Swiss-Prot record:
Gene name of the encoded protein: ygfZ
Native source species: Escherichia coli O7:K1 (strain IAI39 / ExPEC)
Annotated S-S bridges: none
Compartments where located: Cytoplasm
GO cellular component, as recorded: cytoplasm
GO biological process assignments: iron-sulfur cluster assembly; RNA modification; tRNA processing
InterPro entries noted in UniProt: GCV_T_N (IPR006222), GcvT/YgfZ_C (IPR029043), tRNA-modifying_YgfZ (IPR023758), YgfZ/GcvT (IPR045179), YgfZ/GcvT_CS (IPR017703), YgfZ_barrel (IPR048451)
Name of the protein in its database record: tRNA-modifying protein YgfZ
Protein origin, superkingdom: Bacteria
Length: 326
């Protein structure tokens, strides 16, 4: 990517975030084009892509035959096919898996590093972008296209926008917003995704979890009515036989170091600590608070106390902006 990422600043929680423009360099774009694009994706991901309109984007999972996610994809219609955004650390391996059956279909699957991914969030984000684009996405119309730019709308944890665009528009946006917006890198967008309860699948956790272990069913990312796709049997079994015992949780508190993706935490049991869970992502905010996204048993007591392994500080469960009740 020729567009230079902005220098990092300590991320801020959504409630206190000033207007911020972010480079999303830890995320990456990929596309599928060709006559069989829709049919092909329909057989590969958990969402019903045949029902997707131009106005929608959604978080779908791409699974292996056992229903474990290679990655999750923020998917939207793009040209005559689809584009998706995923963590850069998993894109290459995810595309390798996705291409395995492509020889029999009229599709081209490729990474896209020509376009730039930007995020806009914080105080009066909509007003700032309304001065630049003629139409902005909203709850009713979550994807808007204008020229070389696609804008995606997100409701949680507070209204924000993901912009997929060319380098010239990215430079123009930066010039126009530089005076009024703080500039930051991917860590700020990551902090917002953790707060929103959107699962973050990096390379360390690829191939480890079924979609429901990361709350994808609560985010509208799994269709239980569509035809078959890779891993469907296991994903369906988890729902209809109650085989899934895990969920995605948000923890916040303090820690002397940030746990890494794939690491476990410790749960307080009386006077002792027991290892539990798998960390998906963690960020330290500018107020010193540490937020951690972790997959654990779905029956955790709400007042449970956790810590990073052998740490003196503790973490507690925070509410997510959606319900897991089915």
């Amino acid at each position: 990517m020729a567009f230079t990422p902005f220098p990092p600043r300590q991320p801020t929680a959504s409630a206190r975030l000033p207007l911020t423009l972010m480079t999303l360099d830890d995320w990456a774009l990929a596309t599928i084009t060709g006559a069989d694009s829709e049919k092909y994706m329909q057989g590969q991901v958990t969402a019903d892509v045949s029902q997707m309109t131009e106005d929608q984007h959604l978080l779908a999972a791409h699974c292996d035959a056992k229903g474990k996610m290679w990655s999750n994809l923020r998917l939207f219609r793009d040209g005559d096919g689809f584009a998706w955004i995923e963590r850069r650390s998993v894109r290459e391996s995810q595309l390798t898996e996705l291409k395995k059956y492509a020889v029999f279909s009229k599709v081209t699957i490729a990474p896209d590093d020509e376009r730039v991914l930007l995020g806009v969030a914080g105080f009066q984000a909509r007003a700032a972008l309304a001065n630049i684009f003629s139409e902005l996405p909203s709850k009713e119309k979550q994807v808007v296209k204008e020229g070389a730019t696609t804008l995606l709308w997100f409701e949680h944890p507070a209204e924000r926008f993901l912009i997929v665009t060319d380098e010239a528009t990215a430079n123009m946006l930066t010039d126009k917003l530089r005076g009024e917006a703080e500039l930051n890198n991917s860590q700020q967008w990551l902090a917002l995704n953790i707060e929103a309860g959107f699962p973050v699948i990096d390379a360390a956790n690829s191939g480890q979890f079924i979609p429901q272990a990361t709350n994808l069913q609560a985010l509208g990312g799994i269709s239980f009515k569509k035809g078959c796709y890779t891993g469907q049997e296991m994903v369906a079994r988890a729902k209809f036989r109650g085989a899934n015992k895990r969920a995605l949780w948000l923890l916040a508190g303090s820690a002397s170091r940030l746990p890494e993706a794939g690491e476990d935490l410790e749960l307080k049991m009386g006077e002792n600590w027991r290892r539990t869970g798998t960390v998906l992502a963690a960020v330290k905010l500018e107020d010193g608070q540490v937020v951690v996204q972790v997959v654990m048993n779905n029956d955790m007591e709400p007042d449970s106390i956790f810590r990073v392994r052998d740490d003196a500080n503790t973490l507690r469960i925070e509410p997510l902006p959606y319900s897991l009740e089915e």
